[in-house]
Amino acid sequence: MAITIVSNFTSGRFYPSANPINTTVTSNNSGKCNFRYICDLYVNGTKVFTDKIFPDPNTGYGFFLLSRVLQDYIATLGLSNSFAMFNLGASAAAPSASLSVYCRFGEEYDNTINCDGTVLQYPNLATSTTFFVYEGAFDYEDFPTYNHTNYLMGTASATASKSFLTNSPREVDVTYNDTYYLDFLTMATINSNWRLIVTINGVLFTQFIAPTLTNVRRYRLAVGPLNINKLTGAPIINQEITSYEVYLAHNNIRQSEIFRFNVKDPKTFTTRLGFVGLLGGIEHFTFYHRNQKGFTIDRRTYEKTLGRNISNAWSYTVGDRGTTTYKLNAQEQHRVSTYCSQDMSEWLYEMWLSPDVFTYRRPELQEIRIYDEAGTYTGTPDSRILFWVNDTSNLRAGDFIVVIPEKIEGYVEFIGRFQIVSVVGNIVDVGATYGSYYPPRQLCAYIYKDTNFDILPVTISDNAIEVKQKTSRPVEYSLNYQMAYSKNTIRG
């Protein structure tokens, strides 16, 4: 009895889950009666599957194709509202977006001459190397040149530029209430030696020290303006900031590529979609044109006898219903569009291919006016500074709001987080007085309520993708999607 691994897995290699994960074994008993190779698959140290195959008739080899099996144990780790900078990017237990895998090989056969005996099993005759599988998929033309070390963050003593798990352009537009996430792989323990560095035009702006995290080999950074401002407790990404860059460092040495975010003013009509990209990370894209919303409603009806029997006489009252409606089903649908760059248009097809797409219900950004109640702006210390807010329906006394005022050179007093004292009509009072903030004049500002976001699942209803060719002009993308749940209706 001898099993030989002809084609072993590369020890310590990270394999994308949707691409081939194959191994080949052979045995000197492959000519025996009813011979089959056995592969016991271990995920995170636990046997989860046993595969048995007959030997190849030409070579006698056993070819095990494991990708489809392993995909059953792969799952995206959903977003949380923790707003920590360093987060787990995979669960510790399967199903997970990062798995530790190895195989034990054996064989079974009937050792009698006439092939009429009992088939005996001989498991655990050889063990493969341990390798890792992460949620990801590389295109047919790209996978032959795939090298996992390009994505594996290390602890190098010299500057490195390892890639995050995304195919998106490395320069993206965001606004103040946008979240953004970057996943990465590493074998190293995440602890205080790791830092997320934020720079402005290459100059250090701020940094975030990592806590000690469970070793799951895949991690997620929260690097959007909403994430950073929530974590710091103040809107440090504000109208003074036109762009910022982030990268990952170990012992103050850069280990990752540099990702750049251009901070744009909010637009009137925005629809921000998130989706799981081909490399398993959470991707984002914002459509800026008006969202066209509608409902597709399916209803069933039947005719019932009109009237009622009272004292053996049929009668009805005007208003009685003869046609009765039942089984109402309403599906909310949307159509969105926007212009985008050539690079973005090449990448956007990943949204159409994603099995998991969602839209955000984010803290709403509003443009407001900040004014002196006395109307003088000349130094009445006790004069209240009030906010005029167009829509106060979601604001209550005790709520916290984040204020990002217009850019005035040398004046940054109202950039901050405030607690609402009272809401009267459109007037919001946060307890500010002229003597505390000295506004030079009436100010414009953006505010949003300091609260968590919600994720609403959607399904893309387009079955054909129009591929945009590269041109010298921006290209327009349109998308139809519907909510991945029906509206609740009253039973008829």
Question: Where do the model's predicted regions map?
Answer:
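Preference for solvent-exposed, low-hydrophobicity sequence contexts
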Residues: M1-P266
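Extracellular/virion structural assembly segments
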Residues: A2, Y181, L185-T186, F208-V216, ...
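A structural detector for beta-sheet-dominated domains
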Residues: V6, Y42, L185, I197-N201, ...
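Short, acidic/charged, Gly/Pro-enriched secondary-structure junctions
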Residues: S100-E108, L348-E364, V402-E406
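A broadly conserved detector of short glycine/acidic/proline-rich loop/turn motifs that flank catalytic sites
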Residues: S157, K162-L165, P169, C340, ...
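Phosphate-coordinating catalytic segments in nucleotide- and nucleic-acid-processing enzymes
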Residues: V174-T175, S383, F387
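A generic structural signal for beta-strand entry/edge sites
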Residues: Q333, D382-I385, G425-D429, P474-E476
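Small/polar beta-strand repeat architecture
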Residues: L365-D382, N390-F400, I404-I460
